[in-house]
């Protein structure tokens, strides 16, 4: 039995689930009756995790956004992890949505501070885009998991490498 247990807190997105949500949203876009006759498109830039929505009607842009977010929820991706980057108008209305797939330094500090303030007997350290949490008892690690889930973060939090 190990003398110290640990796990990593990460915000990594499953790229395959992102792609599956995109494919499902595209399929729904083709079959929706209220979108017939209106030029609408959904594209995914997998490298940057950006959804590019475009429509000839500004009102239908929000419908496209709702479709994408509902499909992401069904695929297990936290809707709070989706940020609206830009909204453009012209001949076509465009909207870019970014899926946050990393813990930035501000959120890492917020998580680390919450763990330290909880007075649990754990050690936490920021390691790039992950936070390593270590403790002698697994119960303390489970308490930290619960604490982090209850924080109101706009990330898709996941726990990996529980040892």
Swiss-Prot record:
Pfam families in alphabetical order: DUF520 (PF04461)
InterPro entries recorded: DUF520, UPF0234-like_C, UPF0234_N, YajQ-like_sf
Keyword Nucleotide-binding tagged: yes
One MF annotation (Gene Ontology) recorded for this entry: nucleotide binding
Positions of transmembrane segments: none
Keywords tagged on the record: Nucleotide-binding
GO cellular component term, pick one: cytosol
Record-linked SUPFAM superfamilies: YajQ-like
Origin: domain of life: Bacteria
Cited CDD domains: YajQ_like
Keyword Endoplasmic reticulum: no
Similarity section: Belongs to the YajQ family.
Function in brief: Nucleotide-binding protein.
Name of the protein: Nucleotide-binding protein C8J_0350
Taxon lineage: Bacteria, Pseudomonadati, Campylobacterota, Epsilonproteobacteria, Campylobacterales
């Amino acid at each position: 039995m190990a003398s110290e247990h640990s796990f990593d807190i990460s915000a990594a997105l499953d790229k395959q689930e992102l792609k599956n949500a995109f494919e499902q949203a595209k399929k729904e876009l083709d079959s929706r009756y209220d979108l017939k006759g209106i030029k609408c498109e959904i594209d995914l830039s997998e490298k940057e995790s950006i959804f590019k929505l475009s429509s000839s009607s500004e009102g239908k842009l929000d419908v496209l956004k709702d479709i994408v977010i509902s499909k992401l929820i069904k695929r297990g991706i936290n809707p709070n992890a989706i940020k609206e980057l830009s909204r453009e108008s012209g001949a076509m209305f465009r909207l870019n949505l970014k899926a946050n797939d990393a813990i930035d330094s501000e959120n890492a500090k917020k998580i680390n501070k919450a763990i330290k303030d909880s007075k649990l007997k754990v050690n936490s350290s920021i390691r790039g885009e992950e936070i390593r949490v270590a403790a002698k008892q697994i119960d303390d690690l489970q308490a930290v998991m619960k604490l982090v889930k209850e924080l109101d973060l706009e990330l898709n939090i996941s726990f990996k490498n529980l040892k």
